UniProtKB/Swiss-Prot annotation:
This is Dihydroxy-acid dehydratase. Keywords: 2Fe-2S, Amino-acid biosynthesis, Branched-chain amino acid biosynthesis, Iron, Iron-sulfur, Lyase, Magnesium, Metal-binding. The keyword Lyase applies. It is an enzyme of class 4 (lyase). Binds 1 [2Fe-2S] cluster per subunit. This cluster acts as a Lewis acid cofactor. The lineage of its organism: Bacteria, Bacillati, Actinomycetota, Actinomycetes, Mycobacteriales. [2Fe-2S] cluster binds at residues 64, 137, 214. Homodimer. Belongs to the IlvD/Edd family.
Length: 575
């Protein structure tokens, strides 16, 4: 008797919609676990439903995360509507804007690892079947995506959304649209006598008019755009601001989507392929996004067991043009990107040019190309986003460097460079504070190459962002005349001539450890080279007797971190 189509379909094994939570709901021996779950609201009929972890980095410390409490409620509505049972739990988030320029910044990057570890811990311990991961601050976005990649469950990422721009009324009667970066730059301008204190106060009061992440194409918005390009968040969800009620709709649909992923047996690593990471890199390059995206995408790929390297960034950046006129180097903010159609506009333009892989799977269950066809985004508007025929720069906004000063690599945000070559005289500082003091004293001048070392992942520890010094340099009017180099990081809001992630770092006896005041340093962006112009034999002789400084922290999370963290060239991952 021939087999019918319906019989064949019945023989196909359907994915288990409860692949893990049966460990806590099924069988006589799970009576105690069911009793605990009844206390949080589950009833008899709920034990047959998939359990979805709703992981949120909501807190009251920073405006970046304030909307997440509201969005988590909408996510849970979506999970319920799709036939799942949501269980919300929290994790930490560190505010880079508040922790910048002091000891607190040592704890920023390690928070990425703590977030990933904490989400993994809860998801594994409670045997949750899938997750919706909500984040709003710089390190919480990659931390959540790292957790998704590590766990390889059905997962959807949801961004909190960016803040609206503020408007400062200045002492000369003018009004100026401002973001948080303007405050850092105002400090430098005021210190040099270029701005009155009352204008600094006006900017301070205007930069954060409400909830949401910092508004330019800084790290949070860059990583939200990357998450959308990776396929880990719903199409069109990166750009709407935090206060926009469209976000509640995205939240509900994210809750529905994760249950549908379970029904279809789609997990995070089905989405997080090498081609998906290449799509994310292309979008970051075209936006001229934060250099932190290099560090974070390498780390997420590591968790997904995808071979991604700095060479991939170089390869993609060499063929993807810089198209977005967005802050910190441009004129516009994320709300402007939203007004002209959001990240799908950029993705469709890149797809049409053959610079994006349209076959990559996404959390909708459809491919990138199918999603974009359904949205039908408009063409770039020509102002916020340029057409590929009229780019701001012919190559991507981030350049990977190598050379005698960075054998393993370094990163520069080339979107802000007016010329390809800078040659300057080294001014060497062990730590950011000493460099800030020199700038305030007026001893950093045009033509200097300011070197800030022992700020790497191990040496810092924590690879601090150098926004305080870069903002002060720009505010002092030296943004185009002073080169800054570090084994630390830069904020997504950094502008100026800034080279970071220099590897190997100083504490690992990288060449940056042996620079001296007066050495000549040459940066050639077009040829992707960073060199120290000292006779190699003489420079090598400086290594004799090198001893790195002792660890700054002997207890606590950073003491553990130093023992585990790897080079910035591989994402500063721990293991």
């Amino acid at each position: 008797m021939p087999t019918t189509d319906s019989a064949r379909a019945a023989d196909i094994k359907q994915p288990d919609i409860k692949p893990r939570s049966r460990d806590v709901t099924d069988g006589l021996e799970k009576a105690a676990a069911r009793g605990m779950l009844r206390a949080v609201g589950m009833g008899d009929e709920d034990f047959a439903k998939p359990q979805i972890g709703v992981a949120s980095s909501w807190n009251e410390i920073t405006p970046c995360n304030l909307s997440l409490d509201r969005l988590a409620k909408a996510v849970k509505e979506g999970v319920f509507a799709a036939g799942g049972y949501p269980l919300e739990f929290g994790t930490i988030s560190v505010s880079d804007g508040i922790s910048m320029g002091h000891e607190g910044m040592h704890f920023s990057l390690v928070s990425r690892e703590v977030i990933a570890d904490s989400v993994e811990t809860v998801m594994q311990a409670e045997r949750l079947d899938g997750s919706v991961l909500l984040a709003g601050c710089d390190k919480s976005l990659p931390g959540m995506l790292m957790a998704a990649a590590r766990l390889d469950l059905a997962s959807v990422f949801l961004y909190a959304g960016s803040i609206l721009p503020g408007v400062a009324k200045l002492s000369d009667g003018s009004e100026r649209e401002v973001t948080i970066i303007d405050a850092f730059e105002a400090v430098g301008a005021c210190a040099r006598g270029l701005m009155p204190r009352e204008d600094v106060d006006a900017i301070e009061r205007a930069i954060c008019p409400g909830e949401g992440a910092c508004g330019g194409m800084y790290t949070a918005n860059t990583m939200a755009s990357a998450a959308e390009a990776l396929g880990m968040s719903l199409p069109g969800s990166a750009a709407p601001p935090a206060t926009d009620r469209r976000r509640d709709g995205f939240a509900r649909r994210s809750g529905q989507a994760v249950v549908e992923l379970l029904r279809r047996g789609i997990t995070a690593r089905d989405i997080l392929t090498k081609e998906a990471f290449e799509n994310a890199i292309a979008v970051v390059m075209a936006f001229g996004g934060s250099t932190n995206a290099v560090l974070h995408l390498l780390a997420i790929a590591h968790e997904a067991d995808v071979a991604l390297s700095l060479d991939d960034f170089s390869r993609i950046g060499s063929k993807v043009p810089h198209l977005a006129d967005v802050k910190p180097f441009g004129r516009h903010v994320m709300t402007d990107v939203d007004h002209i159609g959001g990240v799908p506009v950029m993705m469709k333009a890149l797809l049409d040019a053959g610079l994006l892989n349209g076959d990559c799977l996404t959390v909708t269950g459809a491919t990138v190309a199918q999603n974009l066809a359904a949205i039908a985004p408009p063409d770039p508007d020509g102002k916020v986003l340029r057409a590929l025929s009229d780019p701001l720069h012919p190559t991507g906004g981030i350049t990977i460097l190598r050379g005698s000063l960075a054998p393993e690599g370094a990163v520069v945000k080339s979107a802000g460079f007016d010329s390809d070559v800078f040659e300057g005289t080294a001014r060497v500082f062990d730590g950011e504070r000493a460099a800030l003091d020199a700038l305030e004293d007026g001893t950093i001048t045009k033509g200097d190459a300011v070197v800030i070392r022992y700020e790497g992942p191990k040496g810092g520890p924590g690879m601090r962002e150098m926004l305080a010094i870069t903002g002060a340099i720009k505010g002092a009017g030296l943004g185009k005349d002073v080169l800054l180099l570090t084994d630390g990081r830069f904020s997504g809001g950094t502008t100026g001539l800034c080279v970071g992630h220099i590897a190997p770092e100083a504490v690992d006896a990288g060449p940056i450890a042996f620079l001296r005041d007066g050495d000549r340093i040459r940066l050639d962006v077009a040829n992707r080279v960073l060199d120290v112009l000292v006779d190699p034999a003489e420079f090598d002789s400086r290594r004799t007797g090198f001893t790195p400084p002792p660890p700054r922290y002997k207890t606590g999370v950073l003491a553990k971190y130093v023992k585990l963290v790897g080079s910035a060239a591989i994402g500063a991952v721990c293991g």
